[in-house]
Amino acid sequence: GLWQLIKDKFKDAATGFVTGIQS
């Protein structure tokens, strides 16, 4: 549902943020 979509978007953003820091 909507909550799952929000969690997926948040996880994607967090992963991208961490990847940006590490690289």
Curated annotation (Swiss-Prot):
GO terms for biological process: defense response. It comes from the Eukaryota. Expressed by the skin dorsal glands. One of its GO terms (cellular component) is extracellular region. Its main location: secreted. It is found in: Secreted. Keywords: Amphibian defense peptide, Secreted. Has no antimicrobial activity. This is Dahlein-4.3. It comes from Ranoidea dahlii.
